[in-house]
Amino acid sequence: MQHAHVIGLGKSGCAAALLLRQQGWQVELSDRNAVAAPPELVSQGVQFRLGESLDPVAWGWQTPEQRPNCIVVSPGVPWDLPGLRQAAEELQIETLGELELAWRTLSDIPWVAVTGTNGKTTTTALIAAIFERAGLQAPACGNIGFAACEVARQQQQGEAKPLDWVIAEASSYQIEAAATLAATIGLWTTFTPDHLNRHYTLENYFTIKASLLDRAQQQVLNGDDPYLRNQANATSRWPLAFWTSTQGAEALPTSRDRGFWIEEGWVIDRGDRLFPVERFSMVGNHNQQNLLMAVAAARLAGIEAEAIAEAMANFPGIAHRLERVATWQGIELINDSKATNYDAAWVGLQAVPGPTILIAGGEAKQGDDQAWLDLIQAKARAVLLIGSAAPLFARRLAEVGYSSPVENAETLDRAVPRAVELAQSLDASHVLLSPACASFDQYPNFEARGDHFRRCAQAIAKG
């Protein structure tokens, strides 16, 4: 029996372990932070090393009979961990990510794979909604929805209807560990500096993202993204790629016969009018960019315009991305917890109409904050800060001359009611959580942060 070692007890790691057991592997799972083994994995015969970091020497892997045939790595596990590098480089143990394992299981099914610094979650959800409206079995998975290995496990076990497509959101963490994933359609939404604590340089980050499109049969890129359009040499790297633009055909970096654009209020597919953009239920230019990317994927997959238009008109949006969670005395409270960097937070604040009380902060990331700070000066009546980034953000706001109130609320429990008070006194129409930060100083993930904000907001709305 072949032996696999899975690192990480999160959603992806558990799904990988169950898929491997279903395929007949002996599976051991480790997690240095976990203390309890999930009963559903124990019942399937998965073995555990909890509270331990990978250590090939201490675990006896130098003896060939003791070492695993492969290591499956969850997305949150850095690839430069000393023990992992030793296992992969010195002991020559095959090392792959959970998404790669799912691909190897489902490679006979066409995939749409979506990556990008920002916009990929909404675009992935839009694509899945369109495919569903068209009557296709095409679940969203990867960095959204199910873990990809859970989709693969259900398909292999016959627990779900046969798949027509797989719609995968792929983060840079997942792509770097998915060396053979070759999507039928690969999409790249945006590119700005992010995750540099993991990838170290912008060039490394770009190379990882680009590899997904290198292996895809067809590529779709956002022509409104300055980096992809002007600095990435993308038109020469992928000369047959399709491009999108909300600014009309003239703004495309390619010919019209490889373009999707908006013109005179219509969504255009390579010169053919599909439907009025006003049928799309979500607001904001960035969401029109996401819309065009999703339309391109759907049309390349052969889906008719009417199914696309119906899906667009009924799309509710996604949790934690400009999610309207409550209204109190005319003040809208909006959860944008997924805005984990400056660019995403700029997009969120820009999309909210009217004067706003902004809640920001968390675990700060590297990046250029100037455009975000400029927009705060223009739109925010006050800023409430939370988390470890609060002193940094307060200093930066002072440095750019922001003269409206800035308060360190420390936590959302304090920030949300105070934001509502300030909205009343300063005549602001919206309270927006758009942190521009990771969540890990106070929460396990951005979803938990957004859920907490939603509870706080709804408690106020209920009085």
From Swiss-Prot:
Associated pathway: Cell wall biogenesis; peptidoglycan biosynthesis
GO BP terms in the entry: cell division; cell wall organization; peptidoglycan biosynthetic process; regulation of cell shape
Gene that this polypeptide is encoded by: murD
EC number of the protein: 6.3.2.9
Single GO MF annotation: UDP-N-acetylmuramoylalanine-D-glutamate ligase activity
Predominant cellular place of this UniProt entry's protein: cytoplasm
Localisation per UniProt entry: Cytoplasm
Family, per entry: Belongs to the MurCDEF family.
Protein name listed in UniProt: UDP-N-acetylmuramoylalanine--D-glutamate ligase
Entry-linked InterPro entries: Mur-like_cat_sf, Mur_ligase_C, Mur_ligase_C_dom_sf, Mur_ligase_cen, MurD
NCBIfam families linked to this entry: murD
Enzymatic reactions: UDP-N-acetyl-alpha-D-muramoyl-L-alanine + D-glutamate + ATP = UDP-N-acetyl-alpha-D-muramoyl-L-alanyl-D-glutamate + ADP + phosphate + H(+)
Keyword annotations from UniProtKB, A to Z: ATP-binding, Cell cycle, Cell division, Cell shape, Cell wall biogenesis/degradation, Cytoplasm, Ligase, Nucleotide-binding, Peptidoglycan synthesis
Described purpose of this protein according to its UniProt entry: Cell wall formation. Catalyzes the addition of glutamate to the nucleotide precursor UDP-N-acetylmuramoyl-L-alanine (UMA).
Pfam families in UniProt: Mur_ligase_C, Mur_ligase_M, MurD-like_N
GO cellular component, one term: cytoplasm
Binding, ATP: 116-122
